[in-house]
Design a protein with these regions (language model features):
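A glycine-anchored, Pro-Gly-centered beta-turn/N-cap motif
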Residues: 64, 109, 340, 389-391, ...
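A short, polar beta-strand/turn micro-motif
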Residues: 300-359, 380-452, 456-498, 502, ...
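Short, surface-exposed terminal/edge motifs of secreted or surface/virion proteins that either
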Residues: 146, 224, 260, 290, ...
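C-terminal outer-membrane/trafficking sorting elements
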Residues: 495-545
């Protein structure tokens, strides 16, 4: 195509002012350097420019590791029309100027940004292809943990803040290998533009602009965030301008975009076609997080009830979404009806108004005190009207149907670790990720369905966003005088009962009939006792003389 003929010439000219004629600082033939354990260090702008010079000269660094060790701030270019950086990697063409040679001048190593921030880059080449921090990345190249702020990237074809083109090669050839772009972040003061230029037969289209990557070809982008201002003529997305892919016989895509989201408010396609909040032209996107077109900046994401098999676990998701407002779904979680108590621990706060609007009809309580006396552990609960992020609660869902996969709207995500509610003799501990008990544990208790409370008598997993009780001061469940033989759960004005162990079972049953009487060893009586002694009624010890 005519556009490509012009591109092959334009690339050589456009990057002239930002190019560095520096020899390699990274000897790829040295097996002891550039490993994952001893990566090549990018310590300053000169090192980054040297990497660009090497790759653009044909050194792909396949299998070599690089790590950014410091924040980098570029000085503004002499004029707005010029550039102060040459992208790492470029796309060249065969002699016919029609066939792209994606592998020839591509980065194929591993670049770890180390969470450091690169700012001030300006690339202004409106007639060039493959523009970004990395122009061209090819399998098995990996770019991860890079942060970008206050940067501007302008090209004509395949423009992205992190990478212009990310290519996996032949469809399916590397489908079981992780490569691509991971856990990168682009700030709101970054602009990405695929500009049109030229006229007539020499006109260049202004295609494929993305806040993270311009064109994702049979490759992967995972866990990335962008708030960039993105524009182009066509194929414009907050994360990717386009995703190209193929699928295996089972229909699974070889390329994917997963757990990424766009938090900006400006994605513009001047030709009014192929523009999306996440991706402009979608060939393959996993149905996961914020992947439908809609209002830019509105986040929707899913937390997994049991994330042990997930490629991205809840901790990573929470870290990616920290301090952002979102609609959050607890996938796989069910709040049971018919007056069943459920434990819950959420990574976001809810005001009293939100609790009323989204959780009604429910009763919400949290642990107030936990005391142990003469073989009886008493857990007292107090009413709550709002939810604190990371604090465990018990909740009684009183709706007519069970509430599966509950969604909470307009909440602000917190990645801070859950906090215990502590009592003298027991704590209430919330979790965001599945917890394995590791075997029998008589110093912990957990609530199950139908208001039944257990201790684990074998290895088991408590799923995410729940809570359990841990016993303090050496207290364990058992029949000895110094052990917990009976348990009282006091729900205030609700009926309260004693919990006692059934024979030959790890199961404890919560009896909650109003005004029932119990002996201290857990035997339920048929009515108020007439014999003198100490008894339990409505969660309190009563002395009858």
């Amino acid at each position: 195509m005519k556009a490509k003929t012009f591109l092959a010439i334009a690339i050589l000219l456009a990057f002239g002012q930002g190019a560095w004629a520096q020899t390699s600082s990274f000897p790829e033939t040295d097996d002891e350097k550039g490993t994952e354990a001893k990566p090549f260090l990018i310590e300053n702008i000169e090192d980054l420019n040297a990497l660009a010079s090497d790759v653009n000269s044909g050194t792909d660094y396949s299998g070599k590791h690089f790590k950014l060790t410091a924040d980098l701030t570029f000085t503004a270019p002499v004029s707005p029309e010029t550039s102060n950086f040459t992208p790492i990697g470029k796309v060249e063409y065969r002699d016919d100027n029609e066939t792209p040679l994606y592998e020839e001048k591509a980065f194929k190593g591993v670049f770890d940004g180390g969470g450091k921030t690169i700012s001030g880059i300006v690339v202004n080449t409106s007639d060039a292809e493959a523009v970004g921090l990395f122009g061209n990345v090819f399998y098995p190249g990996i770019i991860k943990n890079v942060k970008m702020t206050n940067c501007s990237f302008t090209g004509n074809y395949c423009v992205g803040a992190i990478c212009g083109e990310c290519n996996g090669g032949s469809a399916g050839e590397h489908k079981d290998v992780q490569w691509g772009i991971f856990d990168c972040e682009v700030g709101s003061n970054v602009t990405v533009t695929a500009a049109t230029s030229g006229e007539g037969e020499d006109a260049l289209p202004g295609w494929y602009a993305g806040g993270i990557v311009g064109d994702l070809k049979v490759s992967r982008a995972t866990g990335c965030i962008s708030a960039a201002t993105v524009s182009g003529a066509e194929y414009v997305g907050g994360i990717a301008g386009s995703i190209s892919h193929d699928k295996d016989a089972a229909g699974s895509p070889y390329g994917s975009l997963t757990d990424c989201f766009y938090t900006g408010n400006s994605v513009t396609a001047t030709e009014n076609k192929y523009a999306g909040t996440i991706v402009g032209l979608n060939g393959s996107v996993d149905d996961d997080d914020n992947l439908t077109d809609g209002t830019a900046g509105k986040l929707v994401f899913t937390l997994l009830d049991n994330d042990s098999e997930a490629a991205i676990n809840n901790a990573t998701r929470l870290s990616n979404y920290d301090d952002l407002e979102a609609n959050v779904t607890l996938s796989g979680r069910t709040l049971y009806k018919d007056n069943s108590w459920n434990t819950i621990c959420l990574p976001f706060a809810m005001t009293a108004e939100q609790v009323t609007a989204q959780l009604a009809p429910t009763k919400l309580m949290t642990l107030s005190t936990a005391t142990f006396d003469d073989g009886t552990l008493t857990l007292n609960f107090a009413d709550a009207t709002e939810i604190e992020a990371g604090k465990p609660y018990i909740i009684k869902w009183t709706g007519n149907t069970e509430w599966g996969n509950p969604t909470f709207t307009g909440v602000t995500v917190s990645s801070a670790a859950p906090t215990d509610v502590t009592g003298t003799d027991a704590n209430f501990h919330g979790i965001y990720t599945p917890y394995s008990t590791g075997g029998e544990n008589k110093s912990m208790l957990y609530l199950g369905a139908e208001n039944k409370i257990y201790y684990p008598n074998a290895d088991m997993t408590i799923n995410a966003f729940r809570a359990y009780f841990t016993l303090n001061n050496g207290i364990t469940v058992g029949d000895l005088p110094q052990q917990a033989r009976a348990f009282v759960l006091n729900f205030g004005d609700e009926s309260t009962g004693i919990v006692n162990a059934e024979a030959n079972s790890s199961l404890f049953i919560l009896h909650s009939s109003l005004n029932e009487w119990y002996t201290l060893d857990g035997r339920r009586l048929t009515g108020k006792p007439s014999r003198a002694g100490v008894y339990i009624n409505n969660g309190k010890k009563i002395v009858i003389k």
